[in-house]
Curated annotation (Swiss-Prot):
A lipid is attached at residue 18 (N-palmitoyl cysteine). This is Cation efflux system protein CusC. The lineage of its organism: Bacteria, Pseudomonadati, Pseudomonadota, Gammaproteobacteria, Enterobacterales. The keyword Lipoprotein applies. Residues 1-17 form the signal peptide.
Length: 460
């Protein structure tokens, strides 16, 4: 039988060769089967949780515009996309080793005598060479599978960068809003303190107040000016952070006060299964890495067995181009080769040990990813109710402080209390207004964190 007829048979036999990789089994999830949920933000238990697209989750149109711009220009996302392309090319490169390699060649030579003999010897040759490795024990197949899983893991890593970018842009935008609102409160408070200073100064001239009260009024003015400078710096830093995420340094949107309706609340069914974590890209990335490590064990095991390669070719040679392709000038060759590992000082065993240890490391990494993801969701759920309770209490406290300040001012005007009582009420009101803003921002960030922890942010 000619080599040309043997080659397709060998190819089919090699491609259906056995695999020495262990059967893959997904590790059990090292977390509770369900999340512990309060009644806050729950929907009907019969409803399954579905991640809303980010265009639905975020209500504020400005946030949507910024996210779209970041997805187009952000350098981290662009780098992640390039890594996916690199991993895809690497997979194609490795997978190509499983198939026959066919190369053509042609050459010509001219030679003569340096002593003056004019006779010139000419020689022309051409040929085709084919080579193929018989993958009886699945070494090449498993190496290709490992690269395929690495490629899929890189795709999931790119998804994770995408989701993180959506989250970071939204949080950065809300942080800009917070910094602007804090600055507005500080400037408003400064105007109130200046009015109080003018009033105390007027009373001092009439003898109804004293120098101590005037100095106290001047002191809170300077303290507030310091706070304004701090808030201005925070606003500038928030703008810089947002521009970095956007990947461009164009004009940013005008900062506005914090809007509590900028996003939807994440609605979760009672008895939410922790299986939902398996849709997170970081966990899917870890699983693909585990499957790659599993395939590498198969490749390492195959190194203990013989490897067979086939080389075949046809060629022609002639001193004249016109007769180069005559049948009488052609020849063929077929060279099978087998390599049997006999002694390599434990190299193959060491490679297998490394592959098995790395597979065990991948299992641990996969389990860690799941535990971290479970904690992120559990923390966000626990903080959700706490923040709502804190905001309600602080708003009631704020209303009480507004009444207290009004009464303190009235009593001071009638000489019933010292100016220190007014200052204490003003300071408390100022601090509480800032606290309410901080809590509202924290609630927004926590809702985004919960949305992201459940794998949201990939789809539009």
């Amino acid at each position: 039988m000619s080599p040309c007829k043997l080659l397709p048979f060998c190819v089919a036999l090699a491609l259906t060769g056995c695999s020495l990789a262990p059967d893959y089994q997904r590790p059990a999830m090292p977390v509770p089967q369900q999340f512990s949920l309060s009644q806050n933000g729950l929907v009907n238990a019969a409803d399954n949780y579905q991640n809303a697209g980010w265009r639905t989750f975020f209500v504020d149109n400005q946030v949507k515009t910024l996210i779209s711009e970041a997805l187009e220009n952000n350098r981290d996302l662009r780098m992640a996309t390039l890594k996916v392309q690199e991993a895809r090319a690497q997979y194609r490169l490795t997978d190509a080793d499983r198939y026959p390699q066919l190369n053509g060649e042609g050459s010509g030579s001219w030679s003569g005598n340096l002593k003056g003999d004019s006779a010139t010897t000419r020689e022309f040759s051409t040929g085709l060479n084919a080579s193929f490795d018989l993958d009886f024990f699945g070494r090449l197949k498993n190496m290709s599978e490992a690269e395929r899983q690495n490629y899929l893991a890189t795709e999931e890593a790119q998804r994770a960068v995408h989701i993180l970018l959506v989250s970071n842009v939204a949080q950065s935008y809300f942080n800009q809003q917070l910094a602007y609102a804090q600055l507005q409160i500080a400037e408003e408070t400064l105007r109130n303190y200046q009015q109080s200073y003018a009033f105390v100064e007027k009373q001092l001239l009439t003898g109804s107040s004293n120098v101590l009260a005037l100095e106290q009024a001047r002191g809170v003015i300077e303290s507030t000016r310091s706070d304004i400078a701090k808030r201005q710096g925070e606003l500038a830093q928030a703008n810089n952070a947002l521009q970095l995420l956007l990947g461009s340094y164009g004009k940013l949107p005008q900062a506005q006060t914090v809007n509590s309706d900028s996003l939807q609340s994440v609605k979760l069914p009672a008895g939410l299964s922790s299986q939902i974590l398996l849709q997170r890209p970081d966990i899917m990335e870890a699983e693909h890495a585990l499957m790659a490590a599993n395939a590498n064990i198969g490749a390492a095991r195959a190194a203990f067995f013989p490897s067979i390669s086939l080389t075949s070719g046809i060629s022609t040679a002639s001193s004249d181009l016109s007769s180069l392709f005559n049948a009488s000038s052609g020849m063929w060759n077929f060279i099978p080769k087998i390599e049997i590992p006999i002694f390599n000082a434990g190299r193959n065993q060491a490679n297998l040990d490394i592959a098995e240890i790395r597979q065990q490391q991948s299992v641990v990494n996969y389990e860690q990813k799941i535990q971290n993801a479970f904690k992120e969701v559990a923390d966000a759920l626990a903080l959700r109710q706490s923040l709502n309770d804190q905001i309600s209490a602080q708003q009631r406290y704020l209303a009480s402080l507004q009444i207290t300040l009004q009464r303190a001012r009235a009593l001071y005007q009638h000489g019933a209390v010292s100016y220190l009582e007014v200052l204490d009420a003003e300071r408390s009101l100022f601090a509480t207004r800032q606290t309410v803003l901080d809590l509202n921002y924290a609630r927004q960030v926590n809702e985004i964190s919960l949305y992201t922890a459940l794998g949201g942010g990939w789809q539009q």
